[in-house]
Amino acid sequence: MDKMKSYIYFFTIACIIAVIYCVLVNLLQINVIPVVLAFSLILILTISTINKKIAHKMEDIEVLFMLLVLAFFAYAIYKLYIPV
């Protein structure tokens, strides 16, 4: 149970950082609102994992979510440094 909680806490921290990064990129007038909404939804799902069954499923697909956060950072850097 403690291992599961630590995974959820780490993932929550990663989502919070991703949302903050999205807001900062958006302040530079680059439209990343859909990404902010997606990560906000994931953050809400992560924080609301009170049900043990849902928490175990989140633990099972944790690596996928971490890859999603990594892909988000790559996308944000692409939008920030390579203008269209």
Swiss-Prot record:
Residues spanning the membrane: 8-28, 30-50, 63-83
Primary location class: membrane
GO cellular component, one term: plasma membrane
Keywords: Cell membrane, Membrane, Transmembrane, Transmembrane helix
Compartments, as annotated in UniProt: Cell membrane
InterPro entries: Prd_NiFe_hyd_3_EhaK
Protein name: Uncharacterized protein MJ0519
Membrane topology label: Multi-pass membrane protein
